[in-house]
Regions:
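Donor-sugar nucleotide-binding helix/loop cap in glycosyltransferases
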Residues: 2-175
Length: 175
């Protein structure tokens, strides 16, 4: 399927804008899932246990929900691990098992309409994918582009092609 034909098929679908995540780093989304794995938790508790800002906790929790890894109840908001989230936590980060579960969550949840386009080979161009995201989510072009970039950042990990980095490799060396 070409970029343009996939984009046309997505334009016919509507996706709630809350279901199109703003979180681009699957490691931080996984951290939210890990905390939810300790038992139902509130957003303030997630902030405390992850050291993420309120805004970023919201972004990452909505992304985990869109992937089917957590649920969110209302009044009070409680974030609870799903069986898919539990299965994912039993896998190692960056493993084929994790990729399979993340991909399954992506394909079967509210992000499903984007799956065939995002996971296609070759990858869609940012412009074409952003247009599809914008049309499906009724988003402004700038917002659609930002969210499309975030989703495309997940692509290699969902396909099982991402390589994990050890924490030592990610540290800033000052001396």
């Amino acid at each position: 399927m070409s970029d343009s034909s996939a984009a046309l098929s997505i334009e016919c679908v509507r996706v709630n804008s809350l279901d199109i995540p703003q979180a681009r780093d699957l490691d931080t989304i996984r951290r939210v899932i890990e905390v939810a794995g300790q038992g139902p938790t509130t957003l303030p508790n997630l902030m405390e246990l992850t050291s993420f800002s309120k805004r970023h906790v919201h972004y990452r929790t909505h992304a985990a929900r869109a992937l089917g890894m957590v649920t969110m109840s209302r009044d009070p908001v409680l974030v609870t691990l799903t069986s898919a989230g539990s299965e994912m936590l039993a896998t190692a980060p960056y493993s084929k098992g994790e990729a399979e579960l993340l991909r399954k969550g992506f394909e079967s949840g509210p992000l499903g309409p984007f799956a065939s386009m995002m996971l296609a080979t070759p990858a869609p161009t940012l412009d074409v994918f952003a247009a599809a995201v914008g049309a499906a989510g009724l988003l402004s072009p700038a917002t659609a582009r930002h969210r499309a970039q975030g989703l495309l950042a997940w692509r290699t990990r969902l396909l099982g092609e991402a390589k994990g980095t050890q924490s030592e490799d990610r540290q800033l060396i000052l001396f």
